[in-house]
Curated annotation (Swiss-Prot):
Domain of life (superkingdom): Bacteria
Protein name: UPF0306 protein Cj1449c
InterPro entries, per the entry: Split_barrel_FMN-bd, UPF0306
Xref: HAMAP family: UPF0306
Originating species: Campylobacter jejuni subsp. jejuni serotype O:2 (strain ATCC 700819 / NCTC 11168)
Amino acid sequence: MDERILEFIKNEQLLSWAMIDEKGVYTASAFYAFDEKNLAFIIASHEDTKHIRLASENSSIALNIAKESKIAFLKGVQAKAEFKMASKEQMKIYFSKFPFAKFDKSAKIYALELFWLKFTNNALGLSKKLEFYKK
């Protein structure tokens, strides 16, 4: 993955993600840590939430991270990923970034494993996009 994309991802911590429900698309937001080795966003949530139930039923999800409202400075990521339970190593990554999350014993840790990503950075030029495909 291009270093400029990784730098953007590592400097942010909030994403929006979408999954399918019975009427179409459903969205949620989550704080994340990033697993560089496995190229996965790591999030925490509760099993009984609608977004976790939906992602468990259909693991193909989309996500978005956007920063800056001025068009000339817009930076952001659009991505497709697979929803999974986090590994023990990913749990360590998440808790090292958000140690207070350990206190919520009912929350589970999940991974959104990337398979496609598009990075927009208008500071590079309005038509310049960087894409990543997992091999």
